Amino acid sequence: MGWVDTPSETFVARHDVRDTADAERVLTQLELARTRLEQRFQADVGELEVVLHSSLAQLDAAQPWVPLARRLTAPAARRYVVGWAGQREIHVLCPRLLAHRASNVEGSLEMLMLAPAALLSRRYVAASHPKLPPPATPGRIARWSRWAWLVEGAAQWLSGQTRHVRPAVARRLREGPKPDFPPSRTDAMLLGGTIFDLLAREEGDRACVTLARGPHPDGPIRALEVAFPRSLRHTEEAWRSHLGRLGE
């Protein structure tokens, strides 16, 4: 099957001809997400190409950082590492493959289908933090390791994935060691959004956007101390209680 292009107002999708209808739905999702993101971020990411890959091998070959990120991610969240947001391109599995990767638990399919919006959200967050990827240079990846919980968590919250994360969080708590606070890069894809979910409950959406946008010149710990107006120890206790409720 050949590749074709499907345009929308601010995106162009490249995809297998079999995926034309799905590409149109992805573009609709992205245009709606972009409207919301532009209301919250001052960054301009310009026109973006969306590449819908028809196999995992194709995605990994096009974006070598993706298989590495998958290996660095906790097992409970690896199925959700399905793309990468570059400077001018978003690479993601096509919807039929996203659906195939979903588990039988509630919320898995919904999280995967929101992956394009999550990747676009990640691009907007990254644009507000110019020292983070993209591009995926060694120095930027090293900085991302410290800030992964913010980048991935903000993308999850902004795209709506946090509404569907409960079963995956429960699996992570059952199968893995006690998570770090803030979540390490291994847990960022899955647990980063729970920090934003807790912040939204306590301080409102505006506080979440402020945390996502930055800047945070004094580092991740100080960023959390500013976002949650109390000691870091009390915030960690509240977060672990929040995780416990999600894992029930």
Which residues are covered by each model-predicted region?
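Pan-zinc metallopeptidase signature
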Residues: 178-248
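Zn2+-dependent metallopeptidase catalytic core
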Residues: 18-72, 106, 113, 124
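Soluble non-cytosolic domains of exported or imported proteins
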Residues: 17-32, 106-111, 115, 145, ...
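Surface-exposed patches in mature extracellular/periplasmic domains of secreted proteins
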Residues: 37-53, 127, 131-137, 168-170, ...
